[in-house]
A protein has these predicted regions:
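Sec/Tat signal peptide C-region and signal peptidase I cleavage site
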Residues: 16-20
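Eukaryotic RNA-binding helical-repeat scaffolds
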Residues: 74-79, 83, 222
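An alpha-helical repeat/solenoid feature that recognizes helix-turn-helix modules
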Residues: 22-27, 41-71, 88-130, 137-182, ...
Length: 323
């Protein structure tokens, strides 16, 4: 028994030491601790659930919990809300922030992650999928109140919104040949990729599609990301702009999605270059973390204060480090 206890204690010490030596694990732990405090605060202090706290941030905490990080009971209330899509329409945000389509997309995205990890029933996600399908535009996209902007952590561009909605629909069991998905794919292939945010979202939206249009869009997107990464490892919204955390997190997620199939990235990256781009992007994200565990909010224009964007930025940063 004494030997067993000694061995267990030694293993625990090694685990703690190993974590202390791993800046990424330490950053994730701090970020999770920050969000476990912040996520429940919004509903407690307001009359509604929010896209940033109960969408983006909840999604990150669910992913962290699935990786073994302690999220405690921080999502109990959020999950109870997310598992009732029929009541989402009753959730009333302040008028200037009440974008129902954005809320549906964000809540469905968090619910999809919850369902994947056994925290919600498939029937809950199927109900959310019906709301998503109803919000699709005739051209196949999902458009938000601010969809014509570059896109930010808490206010998605049309391409980010469409990718996110499509991902949740596929997670709900909808097949790629379903008309809703076919229309979304057609719209995605008609987008002109002009900046880093679009390039990252495009790579995520295309997945491993091998049609000619997808290959051309992937090639253009990879070229933008390859030339847009700064010496610090980060990306900004445009190739020549200063790096920001959200833009970097989205780029890391996009490149990470190709790492298991490096042939998809060969127009711009050799396998070792792809791995290095992801690693340096993550290092940049870690380097930007604040002492309280949050990340500075990415805003458009830059350097504005926003609690919502700070929470969402922190959620996206965690997702990029967890992948």
């Amino acid at each position: 028994m004494r030997l067993l206890l000694t061995t267990t204690a030694a293993a625990l010490v090694l685990s703690i030491v190993g974590s202390a030596q791993d800046p990424t694990a330490a950053a994730i732990t701090k970020g999770v601790q920050y969000l476990t405090v912040e996520v429940p605060k919004w509903k407690a202090g307001h009359s509604c659930y929010s896209c940033h706290n109960n969408g983006d941030a909840a999604r990150a905490l669910l992913a962290a919990g699935a990786k073994g990080f302690d999220i405690g009971t921080s999502l109990d209330d959020t999950l109870a809300f997310l598992k009732q899509p029929a009541k989402w329409a009753q959730n009333k945000a302040p008028d200037q922030f009440d974008d129902r389509t954005l809320a549906t997309i964000q809540f469905a995205g968090a619910l999809a992650v919850a369902e994947r990890h056994g925290k919600a029933a498939s029937t809950d996600l199927e109900a959310a999928a019906k709301l998503l399908a109803a919000a699709q535009q005739a051209d196949g996209s999902w458009q938000l109140d601010d969809s014509h902007s570059v896109g930010s952590p808490a206010a998605y561009s049309a391409l980010i919104a469409t990718w996110s909605a499509r991902t949740s629909l596929i997670a709900s069991g909808m097949q790629p040949d379903n008309f809703t998905i076919v229309q979304a794919d057609r719209w995605i292939r008609g987008v002109t990729v002009e900046h880093v945010v679009d390039a990252s979202a495009m790579l995520l939206a295309l997945g491993d599609a091998g049609d000619v249009m997808a290959e051309n869009l992937r090639r253009a997107s990879l070229s933008i990301l390859r030339t847009g990464q700064a010496p610090t490892g980060g990306w900004g919204p445009q190739a020549a702009t200063a790096p920001q955390v959200f833009d970097t997190a989205l780029a890391v997620l996009a490149l990470r999605s190709l790492e298991s199939e490096p042939r998809l990235a060969r127009s711009a990256y050799r396998p070792e270059q792809l791995t290095d781009a992801i690693a340096t992007g993550r290092k940049y994200i870690v380097s930007q973390q604040r002492q309280d565990g949050s990340w500075p909010e990415t805003t458009r224009p830059a350097n504005h204060a926003s609690y919502a964007q700070r929470i969402s930025t922190t959620g996206w940063a965690l997702l990029a480090l967890l992948q």
